[in-house]
Amino acid sequence: MTSVLMIDNCDSFTYNLVDQFSPHGTIVIVKRNHPFYDGEIEAIMALTSICITPGPCYPAEAALNSCSIIGHLAGRIPILGICLGQQALGQARGGLVIFAHGKLSNIEHNGIFAPLFNPPRALPAGRYHSLVVEPARIEVTGQCNQLEVVPQEIMAIRHRDLPVEGVQFHPESILSSNGAAILANLIHRPCH
């Protein structure tokens, strides 16, 4: 049985994500982004993975505890960050968070979404963010290929050595094709 800790950054999309994980027989535990106690952090290690949800504001304001969890557990358990969650992953790994604008866009990727399905190289996806990550010690695995976006905004990142990944767009959105399969990748990804 797989289990996901959903760190809720007080976003209306959180339970859309829960619904996306549920058909896979996954137990989803939702916990608000409040300080975690030492015993809770050890209990998280028994879970299959962590998903850090979208939310408002900058990661330093809204996702501070998510950044702490990333620092404690990166490399010990697979972590997926979505929107604000990706920004928290980027910030925790030395990236900058800068302003952007949300819309429907084609996301070009390097095959990151291919293990469970064969997506088109330009994947239509719903973007609801106003901030994006600038890379530091992370690998860029997807970018927005819209002509009006210059330079291309980062839409997917991966830590170079750890099972820590993030997407800026919302895979649970009805605008995003193959979103359920993208989320399923997290469930089936081992921690190396």
UniProtKB/Swiss-Prot annotation:
GO terms for cellular component: cytosol. This is Aminodeoxychorismate synthase component 2. The lineage of its organism: Bacteria, Bacillati, Actinomycetota, Actinomycetes, Kitasatosporales. It comes from Streptomyces lividans. It comes from the Bacteria. Residues 3-192 form the Glutamine amidotransferase type-1 domain. It catalyses: chorismate + L-glutamine = 4-amino-4-deoxychorismate + L-glutamate. It is an enzyme of class 2 (transferase). InterPro entries: Anth_synth/Amidotransfase, Class_I_gatase-like, GATASE, TrpG/PapA_dom. GO terms for molecular function: 4-amino-4-deoxychorismate synthase activity; anthranilate synthase activity. Monomer. Heterodimer consisting of two non-identical subunits: a glutamine amidotransferase subunit (PabA) and a aminodeoxychorismate synthase subunit (PabB). The keyword Transferase applies. GO terms for biological process: folic acid biosynthetic process; L-tryptophan biosynthetic process; tetrahydrofolate biosynthetic process. Pathway: Cofactor biosynthesis; tetrahydrofolate biosynthesis; 4-aminobenzoate from chorismate: step 1/2. Part of a heterodimeric complex that catalyzes the two-step biosynthesis of 4-amino-4-deoxychorismate (ADC), a precursor of p-aminobenzoate (PABA) and tetrahydrofolate. In the first step, a glutamine amidotransferase (PabA) generates ammonia as a substrate that, along with chorismate, is used in the second step, catalyzed by aminodeoxychorismate synthase (PabB) to produce ADC. PabA converts glutamine into glutamate only in the presence of stoichiometric amounts of PabB. The active site is at residues 83, 170, 172. Keywords: Folate biosynthesis, Glutamine amidotransferase, Transferase. Its EC number is 2.6.1.85.
